[in-house]
Each structure stands twice: as C-alpha cells, then as structure tokens.
C-alpha cells in the first residue's frame, strides 16, 4: 500500500476526537515522518493541549501540554487539587477569561463547574512531573466491578493494538456478584473470523498486557461500532441491550 502513495507534499496531520491506537500511530510516524500532531479538547473548551510527533514518541500515550492560554487542574473525589501523577477529574480554566454555559440547562452548567470559570467535561486523568496530560477515560464510561474502578480506554488500547482487531469498544455489563463486568466488543480485521479461536487469542493477549481484574470476561463481535458524526463511539447504544430491564440506568 505504501508504495502507491507519495507523501512528500504532506506537511502536517492533525488528529483528535478519539485516541489513535499507539501501534497504529507509531507506524504512521514511521511512514510519514514527524508530521502528526494530536490535540485534546472539547466542544465546551475548544483545544486544550497539543503534542507533536517527537514529544509523542518520548511520551507515548500522552495528549500533550496545555496551550499557553489554558490551565489544567486535577481534582480528587474530595474536591482537593491533586499533585503530579495523581489521577482525578480534569478541570480547565481559560486564562483569557472564556467560560461557557449549557443552553437552557442551568443545573447541568452548575454541575460542570468547580467554581466560576473552572469547568470539567467529565474526563479523568493526571499530569506528570513535566506537565504532560495523560487521559484515563471519561467518568461516564468507567466500569465499577466489585468496587474497583476500571477505565475502558486502557483495555481498548491493548486490544486495538492487536493485528487481528480493526476496532474495539469496552463496556460494563451486568454481573450479579460484582455489579458489572468487563465486556469487549470487537470488529475483526478483514479476513479474520470472530469465533471462539479469536476469543482465545485476544483473551491471552489481554492476560499478557493487563492486570487480571481489567481483562474482559467476555467478547462479542460486530461488523462495525456505532459512532457519532465526529467519530466517537456511542457506548450508550452498545450498553443498552445488556442493561435492558435492569433497574440501574446506564
């Protein structure tokens, strides 16, 4: 495939919205050169961080440092600021004084704000000693199994890096003993059959690369994953069939 394309005129590739599997991104940098810049942001806050190819190769998995006009604040469950490498809810402040409110939704606006001008979009992560931001996941997607918090993004990163996987989403499904358990919904690569053999291969891959409690208890296969217009996986749609008839809301 590579031989059929001349990338000499390519100057920069900017990507965001959802993480790119590390193995895929590394191969693209090897192919195109250090021309890929990743951003992290939101509709509410616009662009918050940037990381170029050289930085990413040294800090693989980070989404970069805050732009000069943005401040990142990490807050624990008690509302206290976290130090370096301590995980918490991410809040942001525009140093230009910009803020937002949700249209006709004052309670939602209030819930999103720690104080005037300091807001969250529900992401969880941490800042390292050098100020690079690392995302864990969105709170809304977090799986709580037996009282333990499990973030799907880490599991998706491991499975997404397997050569037999084209796409993957990890969700929490009902478990009578633990409340939730981890399920992976996998889109197999072209020419790969989603069967028990593939389940065994992927389960072994997870055991080699993840803590035991993070490994999926089950796998389902799909032709494609439901996505929004901006490419984000619609996990609520994926969870709905498994939680139908349950008292818990998803």
Specify the residue positions occupied by each region the protein language model found.
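Conserved ATP/PPi-binding loop(s) of AMP-dependent carboxylate-activating enzymes
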Residues: 65-69, 80-112, 150
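AMP-binding/adenylate-forming catalytic core of the ANL superfamily
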Residues: 94, 100, 108-116, 122-214, ...
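Short, P/G- and charge-enriched loop/turn segments at secondary-structure junctions
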Residues: 56-63, 111
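Gly/Ser/Thr-rich phosphate-binding loop
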Residues: 1-58, 71, 78-80
């Amino acid at each position: 495939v590579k031989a059929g394309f001349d990338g000499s005129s390519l100057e920069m590739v900017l990507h965001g919205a959802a993480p790119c599997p590390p193995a895929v991104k590394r191969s693209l940098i090897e192919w195109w050169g250090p021309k890929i810049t990743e951003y992290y942001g939101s509709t509410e806050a616009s662009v918050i961080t940037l990381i170029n190819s050289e930085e990413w190769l040294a800090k693989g998995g980070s989404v970069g440092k805050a732009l000069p006009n943005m401040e990142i604040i990490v807050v624990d469950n008690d509302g206290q600021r976290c130090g370096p490498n301590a995980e918490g809810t991410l809040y942001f402040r525009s140093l230009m004084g910009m803020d937002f409110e949700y249209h006709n939704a004052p309670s939602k606006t209030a819930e999103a704000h720690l104080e005037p001008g300091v807001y969250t979009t529900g992401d969880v992560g941490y800042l390292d000693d050098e100020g690079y931001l690392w995302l864990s996941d969105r709170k809304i997607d977090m799986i709580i199994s037996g009282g333990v918090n499990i973030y799907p993004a880490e599991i998706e990163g491991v499975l997404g890096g397997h050569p037999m996987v084209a796409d993957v989403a990890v969700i929490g499904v009902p478990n009578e003993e633990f409340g939730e358990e981890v399920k992976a919904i996998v889109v197999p690569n072209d020419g790969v059959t989603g069967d028990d053999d593939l389940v065994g291969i992927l389960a072994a891959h997870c055991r080699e690369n993840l803590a035991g409690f993070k490994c999926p208890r089950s796998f389902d296969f799909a032709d494609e994953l439901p996505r929004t217009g901006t490419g984000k996986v619609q996990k609520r749609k994926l969870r709905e069939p498994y939680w139908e008839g349950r008292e818990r809301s998803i």
